């Protein structure tokens, strides 16, 4: 279990690093172009998800999702079990991480979740009201989802899932 947990932590920290890099270095470079066309590469959640998607080319059994109750991009909408993780963080505001196990069609998986809480007022420039959002974002995703977020609200969870089957097999041999 410890080995699987370390793999999950490495994936989570990698996604967090990509998000941070995107906010500090990519988004400022493309702010002018963003006025003419929506550039998803400037969105931290998109950058982290794309990074993990590339990692999945060689490790398809690993996953990362920015699971959101009211996402801008429908691909980020929570499944039932992911919503339980988000509500856990909403009900336990001080908690920073949850670790659990679940059975999937491919075998047991360990998951690690961390809350996505809106702490940066800049997020509300796109996610408060559709009328305040950049038109390029509305043109891409529409005006029905990803709005109404509030400062200090937990709107989702970063969730990493890692298979337990390989380390379990190694431990048994």
Where are these regions (language model features)?
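Short functional micro-motifs and their immediate structural scaffolds
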Residues: 128-131
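Extracytoplasmic c-type cytochrome modules immediately beyond a signal peptide or single-pass transmembrane anchor
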Residues: 1-118, 122, 133-173
């Amino acid at each position: 279990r410890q080995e699987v947990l370390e793999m999950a932590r490495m994936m989570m920290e990698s996604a967090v690093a990509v998000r941070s890099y995107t906010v500090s270095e990519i988004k400022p470079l493309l702010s002018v172009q963003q006025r003419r066309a929506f550039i998803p590469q400037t969105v931290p959640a998109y950058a982290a998800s794309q990074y993990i998607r590339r990692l999945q080319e060689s490790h398809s059994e690993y996953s990362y999702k920015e699971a959101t109750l009211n996402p801008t991009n429908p691909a980020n909408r929570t499944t039932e079990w992911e919503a339980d993780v988000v509500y856990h963080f909403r009900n336990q505001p001080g908690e920073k991480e949850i670790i659990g196990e679940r059975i999937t069609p491919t075998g047991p998986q360990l998951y690690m979740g961390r809350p996505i809480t809106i702490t940066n007022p800049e997020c509300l420039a796109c996610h408060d009201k559709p009328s305040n959002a950049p038109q390029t974002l509305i043109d891409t995703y529409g005006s029905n989802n990803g709005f109404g977020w509030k400062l200090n609200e937990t709107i989702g969870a970063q969730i990493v899932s890692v298979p337990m089957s390989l380390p379990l097999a190694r431990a048994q041999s």
